[in-house]
Design a protein with these regions (language model features):
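Switch II (G3) loop of P-loop NTPases
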Residues: 41-42, 140-179
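Short beta-strand-centered segment that lines the nucleotide-binding/catalytic pocket of NTP-utilizing
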Residues: 34-49, 121-127
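Walker A (P-loop) phosphate-binding motif
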Residues: 2-30, 36
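Iron-sulfur cluster-binding cysteine motifs and their immediate structural context
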Residues: 79-97, 108-124
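Short "domain-exit" segments at the C-terminal end of structured domains
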Residues: 251-255
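C-terminal lobe/tail of nucleotide-utilizing enzymes
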Residues: 207-250
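Inter-motif core of Ras-like GTPase G domains
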Residues: 176-198, 203
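N-terminal glycine-rich dinucleotide-binding loop that anchors FAD/FMN and/or NAD(P) in oxidoreductases
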Residues: 53-71
Length: 255
């Protein structure tokens, strides 16, 4: 493997063993002499550091810009409401009401305000921890309690550890916005699944996402001895590389 590589480990559902695989893969590459970074992008429930003897050295608070209106000079024209695709500004009796939890920090309202009475303030969205554990550089995000949108924090987290030869992204489960943001810019992805009807259904959704993002990917089946053969048949029918099938063992469970 030449050059710097970003590998995303993802899954259509939680509990498939995605984080275990991410940590194991990071440890294997580190043992081969590579400078490896593990980025825990599951910022709502980060737990990758629990598998490492992590020495956290840096904790940084992350902010995102949200609009604020100078109401004394606002004319109530409604341009800000019209330009916002996320309904983060609504006009009530010709006065704009900002809904910060709906805001995607695009800056459209600021740039389009004809009176220039909208400006941005910084809103805390979470923290990012950076440290070292088991010869692996670790960075993980933790979303602030009550903060509804994870993608801005994930985007900030992915700016860490660029000096590593290999960056492994432990993506959040599912196929919603946090998972999509985690997958972006990856050179390849590994989708972890289990051989059950629910596992196959959610795998198909995850496959749709990585194909839409045009990311090369393969499948790992975890606990391959507890279900049926439907995932294997799906991979064959869709011409998807099956990278590994791992049986459920008491040795793995003990870890």
């Amino acid at each position: 493997m030449e050059g710097k590589v970003q590998i995303a480990i993802a899954s259509g559902k939680g509990g498939t063993g995605k984080t275990t695989l991410a940590v194991t893969l990071a440890a294997r590459y580190a043992a081969s002499g590579k400078l490896v970074a593990l980025l825990d992008c599951d910022v709502e429930e980060p737990n990758a550091n629990l598998f490492l003897k992590t020495d956290i050295r840096i904790t940084e608070t992350i902010y995102t810009p949200v609009p604020r209106v100078d109401e004394d000079n606002c004319t109530g024209c409604g341009k800000c409401e019209d330009v916002c695709n996320f309904n983060a500004i609504v006009l009530i009796k010709e006065r704009p009401l900002v809904l910060p939890d709906m805001c995607h920090s695009c800056g459209g309202c600021v740039s389009e305000c004809p009176e220039k009475v909208i400006y941005e303030v910084q809103k805390e969205i979470g923290t990012i921890e950076e440290g070292y554990g088991d010869s692996i550089v670790y960075a993980g995000g933790r979303l602030k309690i009550g903060q509804p949108m994870a993608p801005p924090l994930i985007k900030a987290l992915k700016n860490y550890c660029f000096s590593a030869d290999i960056r492994i992204i432990d993506a959040p489960p599912g196929t919603s916005c946090p998972a999509v943001e985690s997958l972006r810019e990856s050179d390849c992805a590994i989708l972890v699944t289990e051989p059950t009807p629910f596992g196959l259904n959610d795998l198909k959704l995850a496959v749709g996402v990585v194909r839409r993002l045009d990311i090369p990917f393969g499948i790992v089946i975890n606990r391959s001895d507890i279900g049926d053969n439907s995932v294997v048949e799906y991979c064959l029918a869709e011409n998807i590389p099956l990278l590994r099938s791992e049986e459920h063992t008491s040795e793995l469970q003990s870890h």
